[in-house]
Amino acid sequence: MRSILEVGSEQLHFTKMEEEKMTRYESAKEIYAKLGVDTDAAIAKCKEIPVSLHCWQGDDVTGFDHDGPLTGGIQTTGNYPGKARTPEELLADMDKAMSLMPGKKKINVHACYAIFEDGEFVDRDKLEPKHFRKWVDFAKERGMGLDFNPTFFSHPMVKDGLTLSSPDEEVRNFWIEHGKACIRISQYFAEQTGVPCVMNIWTGDGFKDIPADRMGPRVRYKESIDAILSEPFDTNLVKPCVESKVFGIGVEAYTVGSAEFSLSYAAMNKDKCLPLMDNGHYHPTEVVSDKIPALLTFFPEIALHVTRPIRWDSDHVVLFDDETKEIAKEIVRCENGIDRTYIALDYFDASINRISAWVTGFRSFQKALLDALCQPSEMLKELQDTNQMSKKMVVMEQCKTLPIGDVWEEYCRQCGVEAEGWFDEIQKYEDEVLSKRA
């Protein structure tokens, strides 16, 4: 049994550590203030920005409605033990992950994560809100909103690699009905949580080799999306999006939903559709950070999937790297960009602890948002507008070594989570829970 002196000594040590952290934050606050940055305001603002956490990191995009392989030109690699196998395990894992994350959260769900009870099963074209009641209960208990995605992959009705663009009318109609069902489910999510639901339409439709007809599939794709969006919904509650992609595994030569197609569709249907950009879905030399202000010039709202592509859409865990920071900066710097941009994460790594993957990616983007909010953006804009490019460069370089780590520690403290040392909790969860899964 430990003595009172030992316990008292530990408490004193903890108090001194907290005082040291506050001293460091006060020092950082003064440094930022010299550049006109209010770190208290930055922290307060960062707490208000919702970021949608994707459920599919927890089980390698398997879902609950099939036991077949992952298709659609996407791929998970690795076989780290502890993958969630049931709705109960997935929800428990998400809970553990979210308990270690600062900031405001939403939950992003794919249609293949319908939770059927009492032996019930319906196909994707017959899905109903009741099949996602547990997700709604889970989100409401935690004060979170929900986003949604029709699942146009990993299903027998994906014929010859095509869904909404298929020349087979039966195939197209099946997927159109799936999309309409997802509109209804998205409306249910928003009505129940009181938070708008982003519903993203993405398919892996395309061809492995050079097609003879490039336009036909795109015309069919457009008509299918038109049919999906003919389903009645409240545009204040449901935010349908179309997402493009440059290529996928097995569809290297031609993707129906290309960047030009998807952006054009959203532009022609601004009243009911948003453009969604995934920063892994473009040529490796393109950067989504540069596209954000371009789209916000013309669209009232846009949506993002933030990932980390390595040479292709590899969906590596998001890190606090250059492009992640630039994406966050553009969200913050663009006029009302924070209020006009729906942010979600999208990555899946099966080679590492999946809870750690969730937490690392979410924290990395939170850190990027906080860093962006702590930039002297108005000063830098003024320097650019007055052609003081040398000074702008100097200040931008100076910003790279500002004490953002101390501001981050204070942000985490105010959010009730550890800035560092949180991996011990994940290791404990792995030892006590994940390692027991066959």
Give, region by region, the residue ranges found by the protein language model.
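Active-site oxyanion-binding pockets that recognize sulfate/phosphate
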Residues: S165-R172, I210-R214
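Aromatic- and glycine-enriched pocket-lining scaffold segments that form the walls
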Residues: P196-I210
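N-terminal amphipathic/basic-hydrophobic helices that include classical n-h-c signal peptides
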Residues: M1-M17
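Short linear capping/connector segments at secondary-structure termini
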Residues: G204-G206, K245, Y347
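A structural/positional concept
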Residues: H178-K180
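Alpha/beta catalytic barrel-like cores
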Residues: E18-P167, F174, I183-R184, E191, ...
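Acidic/histidine-rich catalytic cores of soluble enzymes
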Residues: I210-E323
